[in-house]
């Protein structure tokens, strides 16, 4: 199994040994780590409730958190989710890599579709899942909206849409 290096790793290698022009401020093309301090009210609340962090969280997530997230999705996107249609996690990478492997495990020749450009973890999960990939190209011509025809959709075992 061969996984491609992340684009940020490739960029780091490309930039090795290059001295930037001191007349310009470089643009940080990082992995999206926060570049600001945690707001004081969050620090205060975390400190106040830190004793509660001594156990692992529930696998299914806390009911109040799931209710809040489902409410957000309904308000923002007009989609009413059922409690079993939501996964709570500390980050997306692990879920997006592992879920397709779990879901496609018993498929003989799995097929998954996802948008292109894509979050590279989708490619890794497709490789690990032995899945054929249908790229849903986002272009100016299609208004940067994923388009999949009925025939492609019928053969897909999993479609990942992100926005």
Segments the model singles out, each with a brief description of its role:
Residues 2-91, 98:
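N-terminal small-domain helix-loop-helix segment of the aminotransferase-like
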Residues 53-163:
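Conserved core of the PLP fold type I
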């Amino acid at each position: 199994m061969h996984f491609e290096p992340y684009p940020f790793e490739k960029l780091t290698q490309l930039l090795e040994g290059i001295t930037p022009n001191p007349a310009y401020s470089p643009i940080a093309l990082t992995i999206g780590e926060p570049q600001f301090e945690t707001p004081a009210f969050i620090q205060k609340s975390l400190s106040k409730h830190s004793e509660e962090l001594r156990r692992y969280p529930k696998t299914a997530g806390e009911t109040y958190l799931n209710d809040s997230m489902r409410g957000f999705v309904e308000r923002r996107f007009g989609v009413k989710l059922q409690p079993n249609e939501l996964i709570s996690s500390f980050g997306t990478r692990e879920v997006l890599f592992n879920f397709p492997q779990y879901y496609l495990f018993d498929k003989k020749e799995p097929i998954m579709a996802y948008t292109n450009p894509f979050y590279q973890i989708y490619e890794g999960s497709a490789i690990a899942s032995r899945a054929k990939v249908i790229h849903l190209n986002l272009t100016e011509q299609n208004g940067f909206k994923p388009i999949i025809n009925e025939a492609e959709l019928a053969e897909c075992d999993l479609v990942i849409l992100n926005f």
